[in-house]
Amino acid sequence: MESPRDILKRHGLRAKYSWGQNFLGDEDALEAIADALNLRADEPVVELGPGLGHLTRFLAATGARVTAVERDRDMVMVLEKEAIPGVRVVSGNAATVDFAQVAGAPDVAVAGNLPYHLTSPILFRVLEQRAHVSRAVFTLQKEVVERLAAEPGNRDYGLLTVLLGMHYDAENVLTLEAWRFHPPPKVDSAVLRLTRRKSPRAPIIDEARFTRVVKASFAHRRKTLINSIKSDPTLGTTETLIAALEAAGVDPQRRAETLTPEEFAAIERALGPLTPATSTPAE
């Protein structure tokens, strides 16, 4: 396979540092990433930020129907000239893509070597569209993958860990050293696999309020749970929140990183039915 450096040179291009472009050209790593998605022949898969098409080729080799969504016009030009069989190239923003619409299918797999600065927007997008995303494999900054795959009680455990964990099983499947990329990033990367659960880990009354509960809980990580969660006045008074924590069986003096997704769900349920005053949308 032609290296990223050689493809860029052939097309008279350079990696755009401001776009976070670091191209993975290591064939063993690319094959492992494609294998981690467990694609079936003719299955729809959306690749976000395909760049020069290295992973795209391995995804297409599985027989899957690949839709490659790329924002950089130079990369779109390269992909169209390369004309990889079984691949449809779409110009678009990975952070706002409608997965089902772009793939023309109600349920899709998703893959991508994501620019680090777009990690959170894209993961939140997957959460928003989880009804259409059965599983995903993303190459991310190593410390981000470790955070997303962390267990309660780990200092890496945080907001997105809980929100993703309600609906997906997260696994750190592969570490990728910086030298495997062109140009090499300043830190190592890792591959995150998300597999949608058949049902959420625990029932909740309102998704937006659940998100607010988790956000408020992690807003001040060094504070106790009650002192952090009360920072969101839309959730209720301090007395209401203490009562909800106790009803959920959660000690108000604990810290957010020690709670399981199920415990956060119990807190949300303990806040009771929504009223017009408590139904403010999550930000």
Swiss-Prot record:
Catalytic reaction equation(s): adenosine(1518)/adenosine(1519) in 16S rRNA + 4 S-adenosyl-L-methionine = N(6)-dimethyladenosine(1518)/N(6)-dimethyladenosine(1519) in 16S rRNA + 4 S-adenosyl-L-homocysteine + 4 H(+)
Which Gene3D superfamilies does the annotation name?
A: Ribosomal RNA adenine dimethylase-like, domain 2, Vaccinia Virus protein VP39
Is Cytoplasm one of the keywords? Answer: yes
- What's a Gene Ontology MF term here? 16S rRNA (adenine(1518)-N(6)/adenine(1519)-N(6))-dimethyltransferase activity
Q: Name one GO cellular component term.
A: cytosol
User: Where does it live in the cell?
Assistant: Cytoplasm
Q: Which InterPro entries match?
A: KsgA/Erm, rRNA_Ade_diMease-like_C, rRNA_Ade_Mease_Trfase_CS, rRNA_Ade_methylase_Trfase_N, rRNA_adenine_dimethylase, SAM-dependent_MTases_sf
SUPFAM superfamilies listed in its UniProt record: S-adenosyl-L-methionine-dependent methyltransferases
Tell me its EC number(s), please.
2.1.1.182
State where S-adenosyl-L-methionine binds.
Answer: 22, 24, 49, 70, 113
Major place of localization?
cytoplasm
Q: Which UniProt keywords apply?
A: Cytoplasm, Methyltransferase, RNA-binding, rRNA processing, S-adenosyl-L-methionine, Transferase
Per its database record, what is this protein's job? Specifically dimethylates two adjacent adenosines (A1518 and A1519) in the loop of a conserved hairpin near the 3'-end of 16S rRNA in the 30S particle. May play a critical role in biogenesis of 30S subunits.
Family per similarity comment: Belongs to the class I-like SAM-binding methyltransferase superfamily. rRNA adenine N(6)-methyltransferase family. RsmA subfamily.
Could you tell me what this protein is called? Ribosomal RNA small subunit methyltransferase A
Organism ancestry:
Bacteria, Pseudomonadati, Myxococcota, Myxococcia, Myxococcales
